[in-house]
């Protein structure tokens, strides 16, 4: 425990894919100050995405300084730092100099596809699923680490000698903030590397051998809520969680059956499954989240590819609306979608269908269909896809969905939130505080140092602004959802497979 009596603030560092942010919270979990700084995206080849790790550190440091200045605060008034980060993005740097040997390879980058194909040919797909909880994909850090060691001359030998260090963005920032004293990650970030056994909670030797990654470069793995070290100005760094897991904790989803949906371009759904690591039969990821004290708890994760992007399509390509905010007004002008379903499978279907050959379609068109019906069907598609994922999670886990906590831009749309409650038959809870990812990191740091005493105290801080209760008869709900399932079935396997062309 740290003396927090005269230190009344926690700073959360939210290191994202396109920007670094710093958010300062007071003891009542109110936002006191925020600062944000974007950084350059590098695309050296088609499908490749990189960041400059030094720029990430510089922007994150600048945001911290700016947030403090805006609130007229000094370092010695900050009780702790919590860090949340874009997951999977991979950095390797020199132990002595702290200089990266290559740019950070970002989670979206597909350059290590061939490495993953080879693992598939070697029959490792099931082992990876069973051990790491993940699907075999270039998304995760393991194949990115191998790619750097394969392509930077002499790096593997240097790694074996202990001259190099690997980390996801949390690890990199902590190394820099502590002046090279601490090489650590947390369980949530480790669980996204494809190198970590989520059952034994240790780095997996077989995966390290298969990818030829020397153990010497790996960070120590710790819980998401403890003091890892101190910044150069003496502030304890006391919380770490990957962005989606931080949002799950910030939403207080710490008991089995509690779930959150982040409505962004796509949707990220996580459901807490407690002490049970559930293997999904529907292509969900099994990942590590946080229990009530920041300890290990398991979660299922599923993604919807097209959420907010469907509304962007209505605005930018079809020109049916001028602003995404207009959708609520138009959807509310009609009593239903008039039998119209929009399946936004623009890039195929994600969980639980996993059909890259599906394509988008509008169904149920008649002469009576107006623009308002199509706009309404677009919003409804986001809620239907969310139900697809949550139904699969409930089947996988045997846990009944208690409620759905929501965050992200689209939660301001009252029509969408009400329809979400109706189609799930579960109440949807919208928090007053929209900064749930940063809040999760702040909560984890604050609990570690006694800034907040317990989860019960935090529950009082996590104020729910509005609860949307289902207002739809079960028979009608299931009829609507059956129509959606029929529409989805018609979009499946639309594109010819490559070998058929």
From Swiss-Prot:
<dbReference type="Pfam" id="PF00370">
    <property type="entry name" value="FGGY_N"/>
</dbReference>
<comment type="pathway">
    <text>Polyol metabolism; glycerol degradation via glycerol kinase pathway; sn-glycerol 3-phosphate from glycerol: step 1/1.</text>
</comment>
<keyword id="KW-0067">ATP-binding</keyword>
<feature type="binding site">
    <location>
        <position position="139"/>
    </location>
    <ligand>
        <name>sn-glycerol 3-phosphate</name>
    </ligand>
</feature>
<feature type="binding site">
    <location>
        <position position="139"/>
    </location>
    <ligand>
        <name>glycerol</name>
    </ligand>
</feature>
<keyword id="KW-0808">Transferase</keyword>
<dbReference type="GO" id="GO:0006071">
    <property type="term" value="P:glycerol metabolic process"/>
</dbReference>
<comment type="similarity">
    <text>Belongs to the FGGY kinase family.</text>
</comment>
<feature type="binding site">
    <location>
        <position position="17"/>
    </location>
    <ligand>
        <name>sn-glycerol 3-phosphate</name>
    </ligand>
</feature>
<keyword id="KW-0547">Nucleotide-binding</keyword>
<dbReference type="InterPro" id="IPR018483">
    <property type="entry name" value="Carb_kinase_FGGY_CS"/>
</dbReference>
<feature type="binding site">
    <location>
        <position position="409"/>
    </location>
    <ligand>
        <name>ADP</name>
    </ligand>
</feature>
<feature type="binding site">
    <location>
        <position position="243"/>
    </location>
    <ligand>
        <name>glycerol</name>
    </ligand>
</feature>
<feature type="binding site">
    <location>
        <position position="409"/>
    </location>
    <ligand>
        <name>ATP</name>
    </ligand>
</feature>
<feature type="binding site">
    <location>
        <position position="21"/>
    </location>
    <ligand>
        <name>ADP</name>
    </ligand>
</feature>
<dbReference type="GO" id="GO:0004370">
    <property type="term" value="F:glycerol kinase activity"/>
</dbReference>
<feature type="binding site">
    <location>
        <position position="265"/>
    </location>
    <ligand>
        <name>ATP</name>
    </ligand>
</feature>
<feature type="binding site">
    <location>
        <position position="308"/>
    </location>
    <ligand>
        <name>ADP</name>
    </ligand>
</feature>
<feature type="binding site">
    <location>
        <position position="88"/>
    </location>
    <ligand>
        <name>sn-glycerol 3-phosphate</name>
    </ligand>
</feature>
<dbReference type="GO" id="GO:0006072">
    <property type="term" value="P:glycerol-3-phosphate metabolic process"/>
</dbReference>
<comment type="function">
    <text>Key enzyme in the regulation of glycerol uptake and metabolism. Catalyzes the phosphorylation of glycerol to yield sn-glycerol 3-phosphate.</text>
</comment>
<dbReference type="InterPro" id="IPR005999">
    <property type="entry name" value="Glycerol_kin"/>
</dbReference>
<feature type="binding site">
    <location>
        <position position="243"/>
    </location>
    <ligand>
        <name>sn-glycerol 3-phosphate</name>
    </ligand>
</feature>
<feature type="binding site">
    <location>
        <position position="17"/>
    </location>
    <ligand>
        <name>ADP</name>
    </ligand>
</feature>
<dbReference type="InterPro" id="IPR000577">
    <property type="entry name" value="Carb_kinase_FGGY"/>
</dbReference>
<feature type="binding site">
    <location>
        <position position="19"/>
    </location>
    <ligand>
        <name>ATP</name>
    </ligand>
</feature>
<dbReference type="GO" id="GO:0019563">
    <property type="term" value="P:glycerol catabolic process"/>
</dbReference>
<feature type="binding site">
    <location>
        <position position="312"/>
    </location>
    <ligand>
        <name>ATP</name>
    </ligand>
</feature>
<protein>
    <recommendedName>
        <fullName>Glycerol kinase</fullName>
        <ecNumber>2.7.1.30</ecNumber>
    </recommendedName>
</protein>
<keyword id="KW-0418">Kinase</keyword>
<keyword id="KW-0319">Glycerol metabolism</keyword>
<feature type="binding site">
    <location>
        <position position="308"/>
    </location>
    <ligand>
        <name>ATP</name>
    </ligand>
</feature>
<dbReference type="GO" id="GO:0005829">
    <property type="term" value="C:cytosol"/>
</dbReference>
<dbReference type="InterPro" id="IPR043129">
    <property type="entry name" value="ATPase_NBD"/>
</dbReference>
<dbReference type="InterPro" id="IPR018484">
    <property type="entry name" value="FGGY_N"/>
</dbReference>
<feature type="binding site">
    <location>
        <position position="244"/>
    </location>
    <ligand>
        <name>glycerol</name>
    </ligand>
</feature>
<feature type="binding site">
    <location>
        <position position="87"/>
    </location>
    <ligand>
        <name>sn-glycerol 3-phosphate</name>
    </ligand>
</feature>
<feature type="binding site">
    <location>
        <position position="88"/>
    </location>
    <ligand>
        <name>glycerol</name>
    </ligand>
</feature>
<feature type="binding site">
    <location>
        <position position="265"/>
    </location>
    <ligand>
        <name>ADP</name>
    </ligand>
</feature>
<feature type="binding site">
    <location>
        <position position="87"/>
    </location>
    <ligand>
        <name>glycerol</name>
    </ligand>
</feature>
<feature type="binding site">
    <location>
        <position position="17"/>
    </location>
    <ligand>
        <name>ATP</name>
    </ligand>
</feature>
<dbReference type="InterPro" id="IPR018485">
    <property type="entry name" value="FGGY_C"/>
</dbReference>
């Amino acid at each position: 425990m740290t003396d927090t009596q005269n230190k009344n603030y926690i700073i959360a560092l939210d290191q994202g894919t396109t920007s670094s942010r710093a958010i300062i919270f007071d003891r009542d979990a109110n936002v006191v100050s925020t600062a944000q700084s974007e950084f350059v995206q590098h695309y050296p080849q088609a499908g490749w995405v990189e960041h400059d790790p030094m720029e990430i550190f510089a922007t994150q440091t600048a945001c911290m300084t700016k947030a403090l200045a805006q609130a007229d605060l000094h370092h010695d008034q900050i009780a702790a730092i919590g860090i949340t980060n874009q997951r999977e993005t991979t950095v390797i740097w020199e132990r002595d100099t702290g200089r990266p040997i290559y740019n950070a390879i970002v989670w979206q980058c597909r350059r290590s596809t061939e490495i993953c194909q080879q693992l598939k040919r070697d029959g490792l797909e099931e082992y990876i699923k069973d051990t790491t909880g993940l699907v075999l994909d270039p998304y995760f850090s393991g194949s990115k680490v191998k790619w750097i060691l394969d392509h930077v001359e002499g790096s593997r030998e240097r790694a074996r000698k202990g001259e190099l260090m690997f980390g996801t963005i949390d690890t990199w920032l902590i190394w820099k903030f502590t002046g090279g004293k601490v090489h650590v990650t947390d369980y949530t970030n480790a669980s996204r590397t494809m190198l970590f056994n989520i059952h034994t909670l240790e780095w997996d030797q077989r995966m390290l051998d298969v990818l030829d990654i020397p153990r010497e470069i790996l960070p120590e793995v710790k819980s998401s809520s403890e003091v890892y070290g101190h910044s150069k100005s003496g502030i304890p760094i006391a919380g770490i969680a990957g962005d989606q897991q931080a949002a799950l904790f910030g939403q207080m989803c710490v008991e089995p059956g509690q779930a959150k949906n982040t409505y962004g371009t796509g949707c990220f759904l996580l459901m807490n499954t407690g002490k049970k690591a559930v293997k999904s039969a529907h292509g969900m990821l099994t990942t590590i989240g946080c229990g009530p004290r920041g300890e290990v708890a398991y979660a299922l994760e599923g993604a919807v590819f097209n959420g907010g992007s469907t509304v962007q399509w209505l605005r930018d390509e079809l020109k049916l609306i001028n602003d995404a905010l207009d959708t609520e007004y138009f959807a509310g002008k009609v009593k239903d979608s008039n039998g119209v379903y929009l399946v936004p499978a623009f890039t195929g279907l994600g969980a639980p269908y996993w059909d890259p050959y599906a394509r988008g379609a509008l169904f149920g068109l008649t002469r009576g269909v107006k623009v308002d019906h199509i706009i309404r069907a677009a919003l409804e598609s986001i809620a239907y896809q969310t139900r697809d994922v949550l139904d699969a999670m409930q089947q996988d886990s045997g846990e009944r969905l208690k409620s759905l906590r929501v965050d992200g831009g689209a939660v301001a749309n009252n029509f969408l939130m009400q329809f979400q409650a109706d189609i799930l038959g579960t109440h949807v809870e919208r928090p007053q505080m929209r900064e749930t990812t940063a809040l999760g990191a702040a909560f984890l740091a604050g609990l570690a140092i006694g800034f907040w005493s317990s989860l019960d105290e935090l529950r009082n801080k996590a104020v729910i602004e509005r609860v949307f209760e289902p207002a739809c008869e079960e028979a009608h709900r299931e009829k609507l959802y059956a129509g959606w399932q029929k529409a989805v079935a018609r979009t499946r396997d639309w594109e010819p497979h490559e070998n058929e062309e």
